[in-house]
Structures are given as C-alpha cells and as structure tokens.
Amino acid sequence: MPHSYDYDAIVIGSGPGGEGAAMGLVKQGARVAVIERYQNVGGGCTHWGTIPSKALRHAVSRIIEFNQNPLYSDHSRLLRSSFADILNHADNVINQQTRMRQGFYERNHCEILQGNARFVDEHTLALDCPDGSVETLTAEKFVIACGSRPYHPTDVDFTHPRIYDSDSILSMHHEPRHVLIYGAGVIGCEYASIFRGMDVKVDLINTRDRLLAFLDQEMSDSLSYHFWNSGVVIRHNEEYEKIEGCDDGVIMHLKSGKKLKADCLLYANGRTGNTDSLALQNIGLETDSRGQLKVNSMYQTAQPHVYAVGDVIGYPSLASAAYDQGRIAAQALVKGEATAHLIEDIPTGIYTIPEISSVGKTEQQLTTMKVPYEVGRAQFKHLARAQIVGMNVGTLKILFHRETKEILGIHCFGERAAEIIHIGQAIMEQKGGGNTIEYFVNTTFNYPTMAEAYRVAALNGLNRLF
C-alpha cells in the first residue's frame, strides 16, 4: 500500500526560493506546507537583505538628489536625515511586502507553519514551535529553501554593540560619523554608498585587488572612481589581524601593520547557509564548509526526494534567480522532470549609488575567448532625459560580434541601470536571428528617455565597423 503522508511536499523557508516552490506546487494541485522560523513570511530577502537595503538606498539617493539640485541651491541648509528616520522608511516597505506575500499563501490555501524544522528521518520533520511544543510532520518530498546568514568568523565579537553584520546593521540606534566596512563585495559596496550618501566617513576594506572583480573592468573602475570622488577610502589587498571593540568604537588591526579606528564596524565578508539546525545527517546529506548543498539541474540533492534552492545552494545567490529555481524545482518535483531551466545570462543588479547592472559577457571574457567583438557606448550626459532629471553620471556599453552583430554583453553604470539593462536583455534572449544590435537602430524610442541610450550606443558601435 502507498504510504500516507501529511503533505505532498513541505517547503522549508518562505524567501523567494521557498515562495517560488510553494506557489509552483499549489498551482499543480499539491498539498503543501511552508515552514518559516520567523514570525512573518518573506525570508531574509524581505526582512534583512534586498528590500530594506534597497529602501535605505532609495531614501539616501533622494536626499543626495535634493542637495545637488540647483533648484534648491539657494537654501542655506542641506537636507539631512538620521539613520533611524531612513530605517522607518524601510520598515514601511517591509510591512507592505509582508502583507502582500502573506496574501499569496492565503489565496492559494498554502499552510504556513512557524517554527524551526529539523529532519527526523527521510520523510519526517520535527517542528520546534514558538510556544515550546514539538510537532511531527511527514511529507513525500521536501524543498530546502532556508536561505543564508552573514558569515561570522569565531575571532570577531558580534555581541559588541559597535560590531554589526548586514542583518544587525538594520537595528543600529546610534548615528555614526565614521564607519569601517570589512568586505568589498556587493553588500559592502552598497552600504558604503548608503553611509557616504549620509555624509558618514567610510573606510572600505577590500580583501582583493579590485572592487567586484566579476564585473566588466570598466564598470568596476567606474565604481572605484566614484567612491574615490565621493570620499570613500578604499584599502585593497588587506586582511584583518585582530578586531577589538572599545567603548567609543572599534579598532581594526590589519595584517599589513595598519590600524584603523571608527565609530562602528560592518563586517560584510561572506555568507553561510542556514543548514546547521536541519539535522541533515539524519537523511544522509552533507553540506560544504559554507553550509551549502550540491544539487543537479533539477535542484535535487543527493537524496532524490529532497530539493534545494536559493542561497543554500550558492551561486548565483540572487533573489530573482531563487524564485525561478523554486518554480523549476516545483515542476520537477511533481512531474519528475522540468522543462523550464534557469536562463544562461542572468542579469546582475548592484544597488550602489549610482547603480551597476550587467548581463552577458564582459570584455575580459570575450578577449580570453578570442571572440571578435566591438563596443558601442552611450554617455548619460548626452541624453536629453538625463539632462532634464540631473542624472548625468553614467554610461551604457554594448558588446557585439563584429561579423554577426549578435549582442554578447551589456553593461550599465548610472541611476536606473538595473531597469535599463532589461531592454537589452530582452533582445539578447531572442532566437532565430532576433538578437542583433541593429534592432536598436531600426526601432523608434520614446523621446526623451533613458532607453534612448541603446540607440546612441548602437550607432556608436556600428560606426566602428569597417
């Protein structure tokens, strides 16, 4: 006789990956429960990561825009806002997102259970509830979408009131005048922009030789120059020897012999998967040193009835990709295989001030691959719309094949870059000869718009051909 389970599938985590999986499963008629350890749905993306940091960035960006606008230059005082005030704006956005996502589950009759899950055996979970009770749940299949958390090295005292990670920084109650940021990855660079935009001194400690080395080098160099021009002090190829907290701040001793002191430290150097409390050993699964699971193309782990999506499987660690991974895993879970697959060229959005966004290959990759490419560029300062709204800092770069005119990569630096990139991405994804830079020359754009940058860049690139 077939075994009777409480659910067809249990999803652990309600972030983008868990939500994508849960919605995909219930739409296919499965009985689904979602387990969330926090009191509200949404996961780290909604409560500690993407949403609050982007809401903070938006508020700071508007303050900068106001202070730099010549319309208000006669005002004797600059517009300023405290970190607490800006956090209130982020809280408002978080609440809206939480209510909306809670509605998704309610409308689709998907059960939400609060507590910490751990595996008892291959088809059984123990749920440690907030009231101290323990429930036992069974399911035929599982989706692990429990996300990640900031990496905490053992020699850094994160209990000190002036030492923060990218989660706890959202609970900061004092107004720093000087911030140390250790780790110049995406999170470190975004918070460097936010704090510098609030006129806080920033020291950005980079353990590598350049910022965001995965980007096209021109984009990385543009960010470095913009940071330098705004007063951010970047220290490349540095690692800490010791971090000590004191009453009025934090002192960082670097292996190079330097010492730095600031009002507080944001440690933003890596993340680790939230798998340590799942008792994965009870179902024969192992994680790597960063708590991440290995999966196949259908997001199955070494146990075929257990799937994993999102940050817990590592690259690309993007909310957008996690949702799609969940949706694909749901299809594979129900039908045995997935016809959908994650797209090859996933766009990257980095919400510094200004933004950076990329899709496709970089110049360095194409040069290494010996692909005959050409470059088309458009400077924002030459666009009427950019001049109107005062967004003169920025550039759009299109890389295309010299012979076939196929678009190979698009890179954008400037305000709204993460929006602008999708116009080019849509053309890059076209099949049957539809991917060509000539599209931007032969179509008509609204005027004045930022989208016009594509026509300008296309003409610039095609004019280089001979």
Swiss-Prot record:
Requisite cofactors: FAD
Chain positions recorded as FAD binding sites: 36-45
One MF annotation (Gene Ontology) recorded for this entry: NAD(P)+ transhydrogenase (Si-specific) activity
Signal peptide location: none
UniProt name for this protein: Soluble pyridine nucleotide transhydrogenase
Family: Belongs to the class-I pyridine nucleotide-disulfide oxidoreductase family.
NCBIfam families attached to this UniProt entry: PRK05249.1 (NF003585)
PANTHER family found in the cross-reference section: DISULFIDE OXIDOREDUCTASE (PTHR22912), SOLUBLE PYRIDINE NUCLEOTIDE TRANSHYDROGENASE (PTHR22912:SF93)
Keywords: Cytoplasm, FAD, Flavoprotein, NAD, NADP, Oxidoreductase
Lineage: Bacteria, Pseudomonadati, Pseudomonadota, Gammaproteobacteria, Enterobacterales
Cofactor note: Binds 1 FAD per subunit.
GO biological process: 2-oxoglutarate metabolic process; NADP metabolic process
Classification via Pfam families: Pyr_redox_2 (PF07992), Pyr_redox_dim (PF02852)
Domain of life, per lineage: Bacteria
